[in-house]
Design a protein with these regions (language model features):
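Glycine-rich, proline-tolerant flexible connector loops at the mouths of alpha/beta enzymes
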Residues: 1-5, 118-137, 229-237, 247
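Aromatic-lined substrate-binding rim segments of carbohydrate-active enzymes
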Residues: 1-32, 155-178, 235-242, 248, ...
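Active-site-adjacent "subsite" loops/lids of carbohydrate-active enzymes
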Residues: 18, 29, 34-104, 108
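Conserved, mostly hydrophobic/aromatic
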Residues: 20, 98, 105, 114, ...
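Aromatic-lined carbohydrate-recognition surfaces of secreted/lumenal glycan-active proteins
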Residues: 25-38, 115-122, 158-202, 272-285
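Active-site-proximal loop/short-helix segments
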Residues: 36-45, 91, 108-157
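Surface-exposed cleft-lining segments at the edges of enzyme active sites
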Residues: 85-90, 145-165, 192-195
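Substrate-binding cleft of secreted/luminal carbohydrate-active enzymes
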Residues: 206-210, 214-233, 237-322
């Protein structure tokens, strides 16, 4: 497979933007920040704990950076377990790694913007507040609140908010880096005020992003527990517990239209600088539901999976392999 890839005579970074522009469309570079991959676990573990049986049980991938610097992956309070593939944004080195990589990719093609997906394919946390105890976080929390999260009881919500601040800091730094290039910035998240499964209760301070125009488009309703292409359930044996909001079982979540009206509309309408889109890759097509969403005054548009549209055969058999 690798040899075939190396023999491809065209560059998708060049071709895709050109095709999009010829059709009057904009081309965004799609990247992720919580999906650096994980090592291949022992076979005994893989027999009962895996991403999905079709293609990700006895195979894995991992970025060179996360493999070279394992301590940058988020860690639990006892410094015993890491959530592989989820790098800690409290480290300036991690933020710099993403910034340089994204800018390098953007320079390789005629893109109109950058889309950051907050989905993760890493093994879910066993409980929502399991990870987020790397040394810089401990130091910042101690400096800010006078409490050592390694040794003392601490306020969970202020800790969750601190984790969210690192995400906002990264978006601010990224926004500043994109300004000279005149590129737009979009983010895709779960609905609600936390990052959610499979990551944790990290505060998702999207209101601040909108108010200060750190982003141009906000895509909500993303889902990490299900493949957006073939709809396999991912890590179905590891759902975790303790989430303040949970899109998997609907805990503390309003129906999407009500949620948009009660929570997103006041912020989006007031600021009038950010467009709101609703992800529909994980929903069956419904003209009625889609029409209702599109008629909502706050919703700019819907997001679909081109894979499901272009590949009826693999969708029907539930397997995209030839």
């Amino acid at each position: 497979m690798i040899s075939c890839i190396n023999n491809v005579a065209w560059d998708d970074f060049k071709v895709m933007p050109s095709l999009a522009h010829n059709l009057g469309l904009k081309a965004y570079l799609y990247v992720s920040i919580f999906d650096e991959g994980f090592p291949l676990f022992p076979k005994k573990i893989r027999e009962v704990s895996y991403h999905n049986k079709m293609h990700h049980q006895h195979f894995t991938r991992q970025s060179d950076f996360s493999r070279k610097y394992p301590d940058y992956n988020v860690v639990d309070r006892n410094n015993e377990h890491r959530q592989w593939g989820v790098l800690c944004l409290a480290y300036p080195e991690v933020r710099d790694y993403f910034l340089k990589r994204f800018l390098r990719f953007l320079n390789d093609g005629d893109f109109d913007g950058l889309f950051i997906c907050f989905r993760s394919q890493s093994r879910p946390a066993d409980f929502a507040d399991q990870y987020g105890f790397n040394k810089p976080i401990q130091q910042d929390y101690l400096a800010k609140y006078g409490c050592n999260i390694y040794e003392q009881d601490f306020n969970l919500q202020t800790w969750r908010d601190l984790l969210g601040e690192y995400l906002t800091t990264f978006l601010f730094e990224l926004r500043e880096s994109l300004k000279p290039l005149s590129l737009r910035l979009s983010v895709g998240t779960a609905r609600g005020d936390i990052v959610g499964p499979p990551l944790g209760n990290t505060t998702l301070n999207w209101r601040k992003w909108v108010k200060h125009r750190l982003i141009d488009e906000l895509v909500i309703n993303q889902n990490s527990s299900q493949c957006p292409s073939v709809w396999h359930q991912l890590w179905p044996m590891h759902r975790g517990y303790g989430y303040l909001q949970n899109y998997i079982d609907g805990y503390n979540m309003e129906p999407v239209l009500e949620h948009i009206s009660s929570t997103y509309t006041p912020i989006i309408i007031k600021n009038k600088t950010v467009d709101l889109f609703v992800a529909r890759q994980w929903n069956k097509r419904s003209k009625t539901e889609e029409a209702k969403l599109l008629s909502h005054p706050t919703v700019k548009g819907l997001v679909f999976s081109s894979f499901r549209h272009d590949n009826p055969g693999p969708i029907a058999r539930g397997d995209w392999r030839v």
